[in-house]
Amino acid sequence: MIRRATIGDASRIAEISIFTKRINYRSIFHDDKVSFGKMQVYPLAKEYIDNPEKLEGIWVYEDEFVKGFINLDGTGIRELYVDSFFENQGIGGKLVDFAIENYNSNHLWVLEKNIKARRFYGRYGFADTGNRRLENGTAEYIVELKR
């Protein structure tokens, strides 16, 4: 089931976010100080708990427990992460379908080198617009996808 995130989901959302970013972005950024030093579960969970308004655009996929989440901003997809233990089970697709059907989600930014994510979004009609910019504080580009 897909439902709005609550403060009770903060630690699970933080865990999924941090571990998925480590797995998928380490080979792109090559910065272990960030991946294993700066990116920590507890501070992110605490940030959600102390600032519950940060959960407002987050929807979780729950099947006994939270297995993934999508963070929406108007018609944009800000983040979508599925716990790596539950990848390839259709969870990400259900979250994208939910965003499209309920919020008319039609755009997002993704790391240019994140081919896996670009292919995934392509299956839902998202295509590269040709717009790109540097990701804040890095030397890596993000590209805009629209449907």
Describe the role of every protein-language-model region.
Residues 82, 88-101, 119-123:
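Conserved acetyl-CoA-binding loop-helix of GNAT-fold acetyltransferases
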Residues 1-15, 25:
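A short beta-loop-alpha structural element at the N-terminal edge
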